[in-house]
Amino acid sequence: FARGYDTDVHGQSTYFVWNNRGKQSCTVDLKRPDDLLLFEAMLGQADVFVQNLAPGATERLGIGSKTPRKSFTRLVVCDIGGYAPGTPDAERKAYDLLIQAEAGLASVTGSATSGPSRVGISITDISTGEAAYAAILEALFRRERTGEGAHLQLSLFDTMAELMAVPYL
């Protein structure tokens, strides 16, 4: 989505380049055996693996969070989903606006005449990314002391529910 805003930076979107400066990327089709081998080779050199595919997608591909951790014990794996594992909604897909509504954020945004409204930025995605960033840093610090990686699980809904609870703390 963000890649297509414009083509002002050497054919790439300014927004995408701004948010991803210094990153390198490649495209792999994890359903192809050769690409899966390439992916596994990259995991062997990685410190962190973050995924936010549809619920169950990594398990169907054979790369669910437990699989990389068996082979690469120092790896920090971060799974981000719409809803927390083990909850009734765990298998549902989610997106920013839906979570804003379900967590109650849309009900406190807008005016008395407009009714509920979405926040002007993708606050759910951004906040969950920031929470993941903090958790990953903590896991990396822990790994420096223990030598062990970690498996982190974050959900869009839980992140927004926590933000919505701040006035009550």
Which residue stretches match the model-derived regions?
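Substrate-binding/catalytic subdomain of NAD(P)-dependent oxidoreductase enzymes
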Residues: 139-169
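N-terminal helix-loop segment corresponding to the beta1-alpha1 unit
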Residues: 1-151
